[in-house]
Amino acid sequence: MKKNIHPKWYKHSIVYGNGQQILTVGSTKPELHVEVWSSIHPFYTGSQKQLDTEGRIEKFMRKYGMK
């Protein structure tokens, strides 16, 4: 392997989310900051909200004056 061409590897990179330490991983950066992770994502917490949106077909029909 050639020397001095590979990035520095940190065995214990700390992942932060919302100001608190989430986990430790290996990375090319000493710290990682994330906005969304499984502890707060609506899919994993069960707090998903269903939006009351118009269906694609109805929107298409209305847009092109069909029906």
Curated annotation (Swiss-Prot):
InterPro entries: Ribosomal_bL28/bL31-like_sf (IPR034704), Ribosomal_bL31 (IPR002150), Ribosomal_bL31_sf (IPR042105). GO terms for biological process: translation. It comes from the Eukaryota. It holds the Pfam family Ribosomal_L31. GO terms for cellular component: chloroplast; ribonucleoprotein complex; ribosome. Its main location: plastid. Keywords: Chloroplast, Plastid, Ribonucleoprotein, Ribosomal protein, RNA-binding, rRNA-binding. GO terms for molecular function: rRNA binding; structural constituent of ribosome. It is found in: Plastid, Chloroplast. SUPFAM superfamilies: L28p-like (SSF143800). Part of the 50S ribosomal subunit. Belongs to the bacterial ribosomal protein bL31 family. Type A subfamily. Binds the 23S rRNA. This is Large ribosomal subunit protein bL31c.
